[in-house]
């Protein structure tokens, strides 16, 4: 794990976690989860991870997601005003702790921005899609540059 300096006395407005692609020699070889506040990161899926849990040729390390991603979600729901989770996808839903952390976060009354794997039929993603208090925006090559502005406007108008 690696990270950047984090001052717990300063309460950040936004927190959460993101998934970052690992590229080696021009090839995608894995994914890491990154805490948006601390910068801590851990490899959660990699072609070189020897694991009985494999998805799309990647070995999974669920403890990486539990230690960084789940902790980032929990800290954000306690300390911040806005939660971001990028992304809830095939790798992350393999962690029961992650699924529970997301469900718990969604029970809180706070603006939450999630990216969802479009094709996944995992119960967590299905439940999120069915929520009355959720607004689903599809990212396309045409709208991807404008979506941050649209999301900012929606959060401002709603909260």
Task: Name the predicted role of every residue range.
Residues 15, 81-82, 111-113:
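Residue-level preference for the first positions of well-ordered beta-strands
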Residues 50-103:
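Phosphate-binding/switch loop-helix module in NTP-utilizing enzymes
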Residues 2-56:
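N-terminal phosphate/diphosphate-binding loop that engages ATP/GTP or pyrophosphate donors
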Residues 39-44, 56-60, 108-111, 137-140:
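Glycine-rich loops and low-complexity Gly/Arg-rich segments
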Residues 1-11, 57-60, 87-91, 111-115:
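Short linear motifs at secondary-structure transitions and domain/linker junctions
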